[in-house]
Amino acid sequence: MTTHSMSRREFARLFAMGGSAAILSHQTLLGSKPVRMTDPITSAGTVDWKTIRSQFLMPPELTVLNAANLCPSPAPVLETVYNYTKRLDSKPLPSFRAEMREVKEKTRQQLAKYLRVTPEEILITRNTSESNNWVSNGLDLRAGDEVVIFSDNHPSNNEAWKERGKRFGFTVNEVLPLNPHPGFDYYLEAFKKALTPRTRVLSFTHLSNTVGDLFPAKELCGMARKRGIITLIDGAQSLGLLDVDLSDIQPDFYSGSAHKWPCGPKETGVLFVNKSLQERFWPSIYSAYKGREGLAQTHEGLGQRDTPAIHAFGQQIEFLRKIGQEKIEERSGDIATEIIEELQKTKGVYIFTSNERALRSAVVTFRPANLEPAKVVKALEEDGIVATNLGGDDWAGVRFSPHFYNSNSDVERAVGAIRRYLRKGL
């Protein structure tokens, strides 16, 4: 395997750092990285992707292709978490805690603007898993009711419905995936056939975390709405990657996390709850320090929160808006296209992800001939390339999920490594 200037021990140390870890070794962690968001737009109106990449702590010799699992945060996000935590711990005055509650409301407004909805419809959660569970726990479902799910949803979505079905007696029916992506019409028809007069909820992923299949969210929500069926979109793989306009898609619920594609602080997330459904949605937790806007007044009582992280989440959302979410979606999709095109030239590689741009985005999963995916991912890590392996019978393979901070050279390094392993072995 190739040797890089960064040792494996150093790589492991850097990779393990994240979020509030900045507090532990502040100067070492930030180094010479900027502590204010640098304007990524040039005088010509184009995006300077190199400037954006420079704001992340990742060393040049590290290629991170794992956005579908965990994205690094830029240095200014870590600086915000550090500064506000230090201030709170230095002088934990009641006035400052009140100020931090105002900061949470500002983040709510930023999220609402980003998703094109109202602040009254935004709940700030800890991640997609919590958001999904709030939904499955907060709806009145009983014996005889049915919930339709996509079987390739994340476990935090599917398992929650199944376990509550056992408890309350409702039935959970699944729509199975088909590979390669059969097209939007196929899935619209498959979900339509699964709906019955007893169906109360339709829960599906916006973009699958396995092979990166994109789903016709607006059309599925419209179909369900005509039948009086509640919709939950798991947006863990679309928030921060796709240009999500919930005012256009019109779901009843939409969940997402900051730690993936938004590149935000860890353990912050969002749940959108459509105004039309709020009276039918019960809180899952009752405690203090609720929000001030809309549904947050009753549903966001989680007690003490990591308010510095919530503040940093809002700042990162503003940074994404400054770049332009449509440009981020295009950039990430272009890099994924390049990965697919290069893998197609590689003998022995089978690509699970659709080659058709309209049916996917930036999640690329492939089988590297007869090599064991877990061993391939381990070899990639030793070569300074971060990826994920998927298990199971259906999608056993390696997953590359590039983001806007990646470049063509990252594609060359990653695909070059795969070709080398196939040629020489692991």
Question: Whereabouts are the PLM-identified features?
Answer:
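Pyridoxal 5′-phosphate
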Residues: 2, 7-426
